Amino acid sequence: MAKIEKKQAVKNNQVLSLAEKIKRKALEKQQQAHANEPSPSDEDSAQSNSKDSNSNEQPEESEEIFESFTELDLVPELIEACKNLNYNKPTPIQSKAIPPALKGSDIIGLAQTGSGKTAAFAIPILNQLWHDQQPYYACILAPTRELAQQIKETFDSLGSLMGVRSTCIVGGMSMMDQARDLMRKPHIIIATPGRLMDHLENTKGFNLRKLKYLVMDEADRLLDMEFGPVLDRILNIIPTQGRTTYLFSATMTSKIDKLQRASLTNPVKCAVSNKYQTVDTLVQTLMVVPGGLKNTFLIYLLNEFIGKSTIVFTRTKANAERISNLCNLLEFSATALHGDLNQNQRTGALDLFKAGKRSILVATDVAARGLDIPSVDIVINYDIPVDSKSYIHRVGRTARAGRSGKSISLVSQYDLELILRIEDVLGKKLPKENVDKDAILALRDSVDKANGEVVMELNRRNKEKQARGKGRRGRMATRDNMDREER
Protein backbone atom coordinates (compact mmCIF):
# COMPACT_ATOMS: atom_id res chain seq x y z
CA MET A 1 0.00 0.00 0.00
CA ALA A 2 2.87 2.38 0.89
CA LYS A 3 4.52 1.64 -2.47
CA ILE A 4 1.33 2.51 -4.34
CA GLU A 5 0.97 5.78 -2.44
CA LYS A 6 4.63 6.64 -3.07
CA LYS A 7 4.23 5.90 -6.79
CA GLN A 8 1.09 8.06 -6.92
CA ALA A 9 2.94 10.90 -5.17
CA VAL A 10 5.74 10.74 -7.75
CA LYS A 11 3.19 10.91 -10.61
CA ASN A 12 1.45 13.88 -8.99
CA ASN A 13 4.78 15.66 -8.51
CA GLN A 14 5.61 15.16 -12.19
CA VAL A 15 2.28 16.65 -13.22
CA LEU A 16 2.74 19.57 -10.84
CA SER A 17 6.27 20.08 -12.14
CA LEU A 18 4.93 20.50 -15.68
CA ALA A 19 2.20 22.83 -14.44
CA GLU A 20 4.77 24.97 -12.63
CA LYS A 21 6.98 25.20 -15.74
CA ILE A 22 4.01 26.15 -17.88
CA LYS A 23 2.85 28.66 -15.30
CA ARG A 24 6.24 30.42 -15.16
CA LYS A 25 6.43 30.70 -18.93
CA ALA A 26 2.77 31.66 -19.07
CA LEU A 27 3.26 34.57 -16.69
CA GLU A 28 5.83 36.16 -18.98
CA LYS A 29 3.65 35.65 -22.06
CA GLN A 30 0.53 36.90 -20.31
CA GLN A 31 2.21 40.12 -19.15
CA GLN A 32 3.51 40.76 -22.65
CA ALA A 33 0.13 39.93 -24.22
CA HIS A 34 -1.77 42.25 -21.90
CA ALA A 35 0.70 45.06 -22.56
CA ASN A 36 0.20 44.83 -26.32
CA GLU A 37 -3.50 43.93 -26.51
CA PRO A 38 -6.18 46.51 -27.34
CA SER A 39 -9.14 46.38 -24.99
CA PRO A 40 -11.79 43.93 -26.23
CA SER A 41 -15.11 45.26 -27.40
CA ASP A 42 -18.45 43.52 -27.43
CA GLU A 43 -19.47 41.98 -30.74
CA ASP A 44 -22.58 44.08 -30.85
CA SER A 45 -20.43 47.24 -30.93
CA ALA A 46 -19.90 46.34 -34.57
CA GLN A 47 -23.17 48.09 -35.19
CA SER A 48 -21.63 51.41 -34.12
CA ASN A 49 -18.80 51.25 -36.65
CA SER A 50 -19.56 51.23 -40.34
CA LYS A 51 -16.34 49.51 -41.28
CA ASP A 52 -16.88 46.76 -38.71
CA SER A 53 -20.51 46.24 -39.61
CA ASN A 54 -19.65 45.58 -43.24
CA SER A 55 -16.63 43.36 -42.63
CA ASN A 56 -18.25 39.96 -43.06
CA GLU A 57 -20.65 40.59 -45.91
CA GLN A 58 -20.68 42.93 -48.87
CA PRO A 59 -24.10 44.44 -49.65
CA GLU A 60 -25.44 44.45 -53.17
CA GLU A 61 -25.02 47.81 -54.87
CA SER A 62 -28.65 47.87 -55.95
CA GLU A 63 -29.86 47.70 -52.33
CA GLU A 64 -30.19 50.79 -50.16
CA ILE A 65 -27.86 50.87 -47.17
CA PHE A 66 -29.09 52.94 -44.24
CA GLU A 67 -26.78 55.15 -42.22
CA SER A 68 -28.84 55.05 -39.03
CA PHE A 69 -31.87 53.37 -37.48
CA THR A 70 -33.72 56.69 -37.52
CA GLU A 71 -34.11 56.23 -41.29
CA LEU A 72 -36.09 53.01 -40.82
CA ASP A 73 -39.36 54.54 -39.57
CA LEU A 74 -39.20 52.87 -36.15
CA VAL A 75 -41.07 53.92 -33.02
CA PRO A 76 -39.06 56.33 -30.78
CA GLU A 77 -38.75 53.78 -27.96
CA LEU A 78 -37.06 51.31 -30.30
CA ILE A 79 -34.72 53.94 -31.74
CA GLU A 80 -33.75 54.94 -28.20
CA ALA A 81 -33.05 51.31 -27.29
CA CYS A 82 -30.83 50.96 -30.37
CA LYS A 83 -28.88 54.04 -29.28
CA ASN A 84 -28.48 52.65 -25.76
CA LEU A 85 -27.05 49.45 -27.26
CA ASN A 86 -24.72 51.44 -29.57
CA TYR A 87 -26.60 50.19 -32.63
CA ASN A 88 -25.84 53.29 -34.68
CA LYS A 89 -25.76 51.91 -38.21
CA PRO A 90 -27.73 48.91 -39.51
CA THR A 91 -25.62 46.00 -40.71
CA PRO A 92 -26.14 44.80 -44.31
CA ILE A 93 -28.65 42.09 -43.38
CA GLN A 94 -30.57 44.58 -41.24
CA SER A 95 -30.63 47.14 -44.05
CA LYS A 96 -32.02 44.53 -46.42
CA ALA A 97 -34.47 42.69 -44.15
CA ILE A 98 -36.00 45.37 -41.90
CA PRO A 99 -37.68 47.61 -44.56
CA PRO A 100 -39.69 44.81 -46.25
CA ALA A 101 -40.40 43.27 -42.85
CA LEU A 102 -41.88 46.57 -41.65
CA LYS A 103 -44.18 46.46 -44.69
CA GLY A 104 -45.52 43.07 -43.57
CA SER A 105 -43.68 40.77 -45.98
CA ASP A 106 -42.52 37.27 -45.17
CA ILE A 107 -38.71 37.19 -45.14
CA ILE A 108 -36.01 34.71 -46.10
CA GLY A 109 -32.76 36.01 -44.60
CA LEU A 110 -29.49 34.45 -45.73
CA ALA A 111 -26.53 35.59 -43.66
CA GLN A 112 -23.64 34.23 -41.67
CA THR A 113 -23.49 34.32 -37.89
CA GLY A 114 -22.11 37.56 -36.51
CA SER A 115 -23.99 39.61 -39.11
CA GLY A 116 -26.63 41.06 -36.77
CA LYS A 117 -29.44 38.83 -38.04
CA THR A 118 -31.10 38.46 -34.63
CA ALA A 119 -31.81 42.19 -34.51
CA ALA A 120 -32.87 41.98 -38.17
CA PHE A 121 -35.98 40.03 -37.17
CA ALA A 122 -36.38 41.33 -33.60
CA ILE A 123 -36.65 45.01 -34.58
CA PRO A 124 -39.62 44.72 -37.00
CA ILE A 125 -41.47 42.41 -34.59
CA LEU A 126 -41.02 44.80 -31.66
CA ASN A 127 -41.94 47.79 -33.80
CA GLN A 128 -45.27 46.21 -34.74
CA LEU A 129 -45.85 44.92 -31.20
CA TRP A 130 -45.79 48.53 -29.96
CA HIS A 131 -48.88 49.24 -32.07
CA ASP A 132 -50.67 45.95 -31.35
CA GLN A 133 -49.71 44.59 -27.93
CA GLN A 134 -51.15 41.18 -27.20
CA PRO A 135 -49.89 37.99 -25.54
CA TYR A 136 -48.24 35.22 -27.53
CA TYR A 137 -47.50 37.73 -30.26
CA ALA A 138 -44.37 36.13 -31.70
CA CYS A 139 -42.65 32.75 -31.46
CA ILE A 140 -39.00 32.26 -32.36
CA LEU A 141 -37.72 28.71 -32.91
CA ALA A 142 -34.01 28.02 -32.39
CA PRO A 143 -32.02 24.77 -32.65
CA THR A 144 -30.15 25.06 -29.34
CA ARG A 145 -30.87 26.16 -25.81
CA GLU A 146 -27.94 28.57 -25.79
CA LEU A 147 -29.04 30.31 -28.98
CA ALA A 148 -32.60 30.56 -27.64
CA GLN A 149 -31.34 32.27 -24.49
CA GLN A 150 -29.22 34.65 -26.54
CA ILE A 151 -32.22 35.60 -28.69
CA LYS A 152 -34.23 36.28 -25.53
CA GLU A 153 -31.51 38.62 -24.30
CA THR A 154 -31.64 40.53 -27.59
CA PHE A 155 -35.43 40.93 -27.38
CA ASP A 156 -35.20 42.02 -23.74
CA SER A 157 -32.54 44.61 -24.56
CA LEU A 158 -34.29 46.04 -27.61
CA GLY A 159 -37.67 45.98 -25.86
CA SER A 160 -36.40 47.42 -22.58
CA LEU A 161 -38.28 50.73 -23.03
CA MET A 162 -41.45 49.11 -24.35
CA GLY A 163 -42.51 46.87 -21.46
CA VAL A 164 -41.93 43.73 -23.51
CA ARG A 165 -42.35 40.39 -21.73
CA SER A 166 -40.50 37.37 -23.09
CA THR A 167 -39.86 33.81 -22.00
CA CYS A 168 -37.42 31.10 -23.03
CA ILE A 169 -38.89 27.59 -23.39
CA VAL A 170 -36.16 24.96 -23.80
CA GLY A 171 -35.41 21.40 -22.78
CA GLY A 172 -33.47 20.64 -19.62
CA MET A 173 -35.53 23.05 -17.50
CA SER A 174 -38.64 22.56 -15.37
CA MET A 175 -41.85 22.14 -17.37
CA MET A 176 -43.85 23.46 -14.39
CA ASP A 177 -41.81 26.65 -14.13
CA GLN A 178 -42.13 27.19 -17.88
CA ALA A 179 -45.89 26.58 -17.74
CA ARG A 180 -46.16 29.28 -15.07
CA ASP A 181 -44.17 31.66 -17.27
CA LEU A 182 -46.52 30.94 -20.18
CA MET A 183 -49.56 31.63 -18.00
CA ARG A 184 -48.18 35.13 -17.40
CA LYS A 185 -48.96 35.75 -21.10
CA PRO A 186 -45.59 36.88 -22.48
CA HIS A 187 -45.47 38.78 -25.75
CA ILE A 188 -42.47 36.87 -27.12
CA ILE A 189 -41.78 33.13 -26.84
CA ILE A 190 -38.33 31.82 -27.74
CA ALA A 191 -38.21 28.02 -27.85
CA THR A 192 -36.57 24.88 -29.06
CA PRO A 193 -39.05 22.89 -31.19
CA GLY A 194 -39.34 19.80 -29.01
CA ARG A 195 -40.11 21.66 -25.81
CA LEU A 196 -42.56 24.01 -27.54
CA MET A 197 -44.45 20.97 -28.85
CA ASP A 198 -44.55 19.54 -25.32
CA HIS A 199 -46.26 22.68 -24.03
CA LEU A 200 -48.65 22.95 -26.97
CA GLU A 201 -49.86 19.43 -26.21
CA ASN A 202 -49.68 19.37 -22.41
CA THR A 203 -49.94 22.87 -20.91
CA LYS A 204 -53.56 23.83 -20.18
CA GLY A 205 -54.64 27.19 -21.52
CA PHE A 206 -51.62 27.61 -23.79
CA ASN A 207 -52.06 27.87 -27.54
CA LEU A 208 -50.74 29.93 -30.43
CA ARG A 209 -54.03 30.47 -32.28
CA LYS A 210 -53.51 34.25 -32.35
CA LEU A 211 -49.81 34.14 -33.20
CA LYS A 212 -48.77 37.04 -35.43
CA TYR A 213 -45.10 36.24 -36.08
CA LEU A 214 -43.20 32.97 -36.48
CA VAL A 215 -39.41 33.00 -36.84
CA MET A 216 -37.24 29.99 -37.65
CA ASP A 217 -33.67 30.99 -36.85
CA GLU A 218 -30.69 28.89 -37.99
CA ALA A 219 -33.23 26.99 -40.08
CA ASP A 220 -30.56 24.95 -41.83
CA ARG A 221 -29.40 23.63 -38.48
CA LEU A 222 -32.95 23.00 -37.31
CA LEU A 223 -33.30 20.63 -40.25
CA ASP A 224 -29.80 19.14 -39.89
CA MET A 225 -30.69 18.18 -36.32
CA GLU A 226 -33.79 16.30 -37.55
CA PHE A 227 -36.32 18.72 -36.13
CA GLY A 228 -38.18 18.48 -39.46
CA PRO A 229 -41.08 16.27 -38.23
CA VAL A 230 -41.63 18.46 -35.15
CA LEU A 231 -41.54 21.61 -37.29
CA ASP A 232 -44.19 20.08 -39.55
CA ARG A 233 -46.44 19.43 -36.54
CA ILE A 234 -45.94 22.94 -35.20
CA LEU A 235 -46.73 24.46 -38.61
CA ASN A 236 -49.93 22.40 -38.76
CA ILE A 237 -51.05 23.65 -35.34
CA ILE A 238 -50.41 27.38 -35.60
CA PRO A 239 -52.55 29.57 -37.87
CA THR A 240 -51.48 30.57 -41.36
CA GLN A 241 -53.98 33.37 -41.86
CA GLY A 242 -52.75 36.66 -40.44
CA ARG A 243 -49.32 35.24 -39.62
CA THR A 244 -46.02 36.69 -40.83
CA THR A 245 -43.11 34.26 -41.09
CA TYR A 246 -39.37 34.88 -41.12
CA LEU A 247 -36.85 32.19 -41.99
CA PHE A 248 -33.15 32.86 -41.37
CA SER A 249 -30.37 30.55 -42.47
CA ALA A 250 -26.68 30.55 -43.35
CA THR A 251 -27.37 28.83 -46.68
CA MET A 252 -30.20 28.02 -49.07
CA THR A 253 -30.43 24.24 -49.35
CA SER A 254 -33.09 22.04 -50.93
CA LYS A 255 -34.48 21.32 -47.44
CA ILE A 256 -34.70 25.04 -46.68
CA ASP A 257 -36.40 25.65 -50.01
CA LYS A 258 -38.98 22.96 -49.22
CA LEU A 259 -39.56 24.44 -45.75
CA GLN A 260 -40.05 27.97 -47.05
CA ARG A 261 -42.52 26.77 -49.69
CA ALA A 262 -44.55 25.09 -46.95
CA SER A 263 -44.49 27.96 -44.47
CA LEU A 264 -43.91 31.31 -46.23
CA THR A 265 -46.10 33.33 -48.60
CA ASN A 266 -44.45 35.39 -51.36
CA PRO A 267 -41.33 35.94 -49.26
CA VAL A 268 -38.75 38.65 -49.89
CA LYS A 269 -35.28 37.11 -50.15
CA CYS A 270 -32.63 39.12 -48.31
CA ALA A 271 -29.25 37.54 -49.06
CA VAL A 272 -26.01 38.93 -47.73
CA SER A 273 -23.91 35.85 -48.36
CA ASN A 274 -25.03 32.67 -50.07
CA LYS A 275 -21.75 30.78 -50.00
CA TYR A 276 -19.41 29.55 -47.31
CA GLN A 277 -16.47 31.84 -46.74
CA THR A 278 -14.13 33.09 -44.07
CA VAL A 279 -13.16 36.69 -43.44
CA ASP A 280 -9.86 38.20 -44.52
CA THR A 281 -8.89 39.03 -40.93
CA LEU A 282 -8.78 35.31 -40.03
CA VAL A 283 -5.41 33.53 -40.23
CA GLN A 284 -5.93 29.79 -40.78
CA THR A 285 -3.17 27.22 -40.30
CA LEU A 286 -2.78 23.51 -39.62
CA MET A 287 -0.40 21.27 -37.69
CA VAL A 288 0.37 17.74 -38.88
CA VAL A 289 0.31 15.66 -35.69
CA PRO A 290 2.08 12.28 -35.40
CA GLY A 291 0.12 9.45 -33.82
CA GLY A 292 -0.32 9.67 -30.07
CA LEU A 293 0.89 13.27 -29.79
CA LYS A 294 -2.34 15.22 -30.20
CA ASN A 295 -2.68 16.03 -26.49
CA THR A 296 0.94 17.20 -26.34
CA PHE A 297 0.53 19.41 -29.41
CA LEU A 298 -2.59 20.94 -27.89
CA ILE A 299 -0.90 21.75 -24.57
CA TYR A 300 2.03 23.25 -26.47
CA LEU A 301 -0.35 25.53 -28.39
CA LEU A 302 -2.30 26.57 -25.31
CA ASN A 303 0.97 27.51 -23.66
CA GLU A 304 2.06 29.51 -26.72
CA PHE A 305 -1.22 31.45 -26.66
CA ILE A 306 -1.51 31.77 -22.90
CA GLY A 307 -3.74 34.66 -21.86
CA LYS A 308 -5.64 34.57 -25.16
CA SER A 309 -9.34 33.77 -25.30
CA THR A 310 -9.38 30.30 -26.90
CA ILE A 311 -12.03 27.80 -28.01
CA VAL A 312 -10.93 24.19 -28.47
CA PHE A 313 -13.39 22.20 -30.59
CA THR A 314 -13.78 18.44 -30.23
CA ARG A 315 -15.97 15.96 -32.06
CA THR A 316 -17.28 14.18 -28.98
CA LYS A 317 -18.64 15.11 -25.58
CA ALA A 318 -16.21 12.72 -23.90
CA ASN A 319 -13.22 14.45 -25.47
CA ALA A 320 -14.52 17.87 -24.46
CA GLU A 321 -14.83 16.77 -20.83
CA ARG A 322 -11.45 15.01 -20.82
CA ILE A 323 -9.52 17.90 -22.38
CA SER A 324 -11.13 20.44 -20.08
CA ASN A 325 -10.04 18.38 -17.07
CA LEU A 326 -6.56 17.91 -18.54
CA CYS A 327 -6.17 21.66 -19.00
CA ASN A 328 -7.26 22.37 -15.44
CA LEU A 329 -4.93 19.71 -14.02
CA LEU A 330 -2.06 21.47 -15.82
CA GLU A 331 -3.23 24.78 -14.34
CA PHE A 332 -4.74 26.25 -17.47
CA SER A 333 -8.05 27.99 -16.90
CA ALA A 334 -10.63 25.93 -18.81
CA THR A 335 -14.31 25.05 -18.83
CA ALA A 336 -16.33 22.60 -20.95
CA LEU A 337 -19.50 23.06 -23.01
CA HIS A 338 -21.32 20.03 -24.38
CA GLY A 339 -24.68 18.29 -24.46
CA ASP A 340 -24.16 16.09 -21.39
CA LEU A 341 -24.24 19.15 -19.14
CA ASN A 342 -27.55 20.35 -17.77
CA GLN A 343 -28.80 23.80 -18.68
CA ASN A 344 -27.47 25.52 -15.56
CA GLN A 345 -24.03 23.99 -16.09
CA ARG A 346 -23.97 25.07 -19.74
CA THR A 347 -25.06 28.60 -18.93
CA GLY A 348 -22.49 28.75 -16.14
CA ALA A 349 -19.69 27.58 -18.45
CA LEU A 350 -20.58 30.20 -21.06
CA ASP A 351 -20.80 32.95 -18.46
CA LEU A 352 -17.36 32.08 -17.06
CA PHE A 353 -15.80 32.17 -20.52
CA LYS A 354 -17.56 35.34 -21.67
CA ALA A 355 -16.60 37.13 -18.44
CA GLY A 356 -12.95 36.16 -18.88
CA LYS A 357 -12.87 34.04 -15.72
CA ARG A 358 -11.90 31.08 -17.91
CA SER A 359 -9.64 31.71 -20.89
CA ILE A 360 -10.27 28.33 -22.56
CA LEU A 361 -13.62 26.89 -23.64
CA VAL A 362 -13.50 23.23 -24.71
CA ALA A 363 -16.64 22.57 -26.72
CA THR A 364 -18.42 20.34 -29.16
CA ASP A 365 -20.18 21.92 -32.13
CA VAL A 366 -22.90 23.19 -29.78
CA ALA A 367 -20.79 26.37 -29.57
CA ALA A 368 -19.94 26.61 -33.26
CA ARG A 369 -22.94 28.62 -34.43
CA GLY A 370 -25.24 31.32 -33.28
CA LEU A 371 -23.70 32.03 -29.89
CA ASP A 372 -22.65 35.53 -28.94
CA ILE A 373 -19.14 34.97 -27.59
CA PRO A 374 -17.24 38.24 -27.94
CA SER A 375 -13.52 38.63 -28.53
CA VAL A 376 -12.38 35.06 -29.17
CA ASP A 377 -8.72 35.22 -30.19
CA ILE A 378 -7.91 31.62 -31.09
CA VAL A 379 -9.88 28.62 -32.37
CA ILE A 380 -8.18 25.21 -32.20
CA ASN A 381 -9.72 22.24 -33.98
CA TYR A 382 -8.58 19.35 -31.79
CA ASP A 383 -10.75 17.08 -33.96
CA ILE A 384 -11.29 17.99 -37.60
CA PRO A 385 -15.03 18.33 -38.34
CA VAL A 386 -16.50 15.79 -40.73
CA ASP A 387 -17.99 18.43 -43.04
CA SER A 388 -16.77 21.76 -44.39
CA LYS A 389 -19.81 23.66 -43.11
CA SER A 390 -18.92 22.84 -39.52
CA TYR A 391 -15.35 23.99 -40.10
CA ILE A 392 -16.53 27.37 -41.41
CA HIS A 393 -18.84 27.85 -38.44
CA ARG A 394 -16.17 26.80 -35.94
CA VAL A 395 -13.47 29.15 -37.17
CA GLY A 396 -16.13 31.85 -37.50
CA ARG A 397 -16.10 32.14 -33.70
CA THR A 398 -12.99 34.32 -34.06
CA ALA A 399 -12.14 37.28 -36.32
CA ARG A 400 -15.67 38.64 -35.93
CA ALA A 401 -16.87 42.17 -36.63
CA GLY A 402 -13.62 43.33 -38.21
CA ARG A 403 -11.28 41.98 -35.54
CA SER A 404 -8.34 39.71 -36.31
CA GLY A 405 -8.20 36.09 -35.19
CA LYS A 406 -6.46 32.78 -35.75
CA SER A 407 -7.52 29.16 -36.22
CA ILE A 408 -5.27 26.11 -35.99
CA SER A 409 -6.34 22.59 -36.97
CA LEU A 410 -4.59 19.50 -35.58
CA VAL A 411 -4.40 17.08 -38.51
CA SER A 412 -3.58 13.38 -38.16
CA GLN A 413 -2.99 10.93 -40.99
CA TYR A 414 -6.67 9.97 -40.78
CA ASP A 415 -7.81 13.56 -41.33
CA LEU A 416 -6.08 14.22 -44.65
CA GLU A 417 -9.18 13.62 -46.78
CA LEU A 418 -11.27 15.88 -44.51
CA ILE A 419 -8.74 18.70 -44.67
CA LEU A 420 -8.52 18.41 -48.47
CA ARG A 421 -12.30 18.89 -48.70
CA ILE A 422 -12.09 21.93 -46.44
CA GLU A 423 -9.29 23.43 -48.53
CA ASP A 424 -11.35 22.81 -51.66
CA VAL A 425 -14.27 24.78 -50.19
CA LEU A 426 -11.96 27.57 -49.02
CA GLY A 427 -10.26 27.69 -52.40
CA LYS A 428 -6.79 27.71 -50.86
CA LYS A 429 -4.22 25.54 -49.11
CA LEU A 430 -3.84 25.95 -45.37
CA PRO A 431 -0.22 26.71 -44.41
CA LYS A 432 1.53 24.78 -41.66
CA GLU A 433 1.91 26.40 -38.26
CA ASN A 434 5.52 27.01 -37.20
CA VAL A 435 6.26 24.97 -34.08
CA ASP A 436 9.20 24.13 -31.85
CA LYS A 437 9.31 20.33 -32.18
CA ASP A 438 11.89 19.93 -29.41
CA ALA A 439 9.67 21.88 -27.02
CA ILE A 440 6.70 19.69 -27.95
CA LEU A 441 8.60 16.44 -27.40
CA ALA A 442 9.88 17.71 -24.06
CA LEU A 443 6.27 17.96 -22.87
CA ARG A 444 5.20 14.50 -24.02
CA ASP A 445 5.87 12.35 -20.94
CA SER A 446 4.36 14.83 -18.51
CA VAL A 447 1.26 15.43 -20.65
CA ASP A 448 0.72 11.69 -21.10
CA LYS A 449 0.95 11.14 -17.33
CA ALA A 450 -1.49 13.96 -16.65
CA ASN A 451 -3.89 12.59 -19.27
CA GLY A 452 -3.71 9.16 -17.63
CA GLU A 453 -4.73 10.70 -14.32
CA VAL A 454 -7.67 12.45 -15.95
CA VAL A 455 -8.88 9.30 -17.74
CA MET A 456 -8.78 7.31 -14.48
CA GLU A 457 -10.76 9.98 -12.65
CA LEU A 458 -13.38 10.27 -15.41
CA ASN A 459 -13.78 6.48 -15.51
CA ARG A 460 -14.37 6.49 -11.75
CA ARG A 461 -17.04 9.20 -12.11
CA ASN A 462 -18.74 7.34 -14.95
CA LYS A 463 -18.95 4.14 -12.90
CA GLU A 464 -20.55 6.04 -10.03
CA LYS A 465 -23.00 7.65 -12.45
CA GLN A 466 -23.93 4.29 -13.99
CA ALA A 467 -24.51 2.85 -10.53
CA ARG A 468 -26.87 5.70 -9.68
CA GLY A 469 -28.68 5.31 -12.98
CA LYS A 470 -29.62 1.63 -12.63
CA GLY A 471 -33.31 0.97 -12.84
CA ARG A 472 -34.09 4.03 -14.93
CA ARG A 473 -33.76 2.46 -18.36
CA GLY A 474 -37.40 1.52 -18.64
CA ARG A 475 -38.63 5.07 -18.34
CA MET A 476 -40.13 6.67 -21.38
CA ALA A 477 -38.04 9.44 -22.99
CA THR A 478 -39.62 12.84 -23.56
CA ARG A 479 -39.01 15.35 -26.29
CA ASP A 480 -36.17 16.78 -24.22
CA ASN A 481 -34.09 14.29 -26.18
CA MET A 482 -34.78 16.31 -29.31
CA ASP A 483 -33.42 19.47 -27.72
CA ARG A 484 -29.88 18.17 -28.02
CA GLU A 485 -26.89 19.49 -29.86
CA GLU A 486 -24.88 16.33 -30.50
CA ARG A 487 -26.16 13.21 -32.18
UniProtKB/Swiss-Prot annotation:
Chain ranges for the short sequence motif DEAD box as given in the UniProt record: 217-220
Query: Which SMART domains does the record match to this protein?
Result: DEXDc (SM00487), HELICc (SM00490)
Q: Which SUPFAM superfamilies match?
A: P-loop containing nucleoside triphosphate hydrolases
Stretches the record annotates as Disordered: 22-67, 459-487
Key word Nucleotide-binding present in the record? yes
Protein name (Swiss-Prot/TrEMBL): ATP-dependent rRNA helicase RRP3
Record carries keyword Nucleotide-binding: yes
Q: Which UniProt keywords apply?
A: ATP-binding, Helicase, Hydrolase, Nucleotide-binding, Nucleus, Ribosome biogenesis, RNA-binding, rRNA processing
Q: Where is this motif: Q motif?
A: 67-95
The entry's function note states: ATP-dependent rRNA helicase required for pre-ribosomal RNA processing. Involved in the maturation of the 35S-pre-rRNA and to its cleavage to mature 18S rRNA.
Kindly give the Gene3D superfamilies that the UniProt entry links to this protein.
Answer: P-loop containing nucleotide triphosphate hydrolases
User: Per the UniProt entry, what is one GO biological process?
Assistant: rRNA processing
Q: Which reaction does it catalyse?
A: ATP + H2O = ADP + phosphate + H(+)
Indicate the segments forming the Helicase ATP-binding domain, all copies. Answer: 98-270
Where can this protein be found? Nucleus
Quick one: which residues bind ATP?
111-118
- A GO cellular component entry from the record: nucleus
Enzyme Commission numbers on file: 3.6.4.13
Q: Which residues form the Helicase C-terminal domain?
A: 298-442
What domain of life does the UniProt record list for this protein's source? Eukaryota
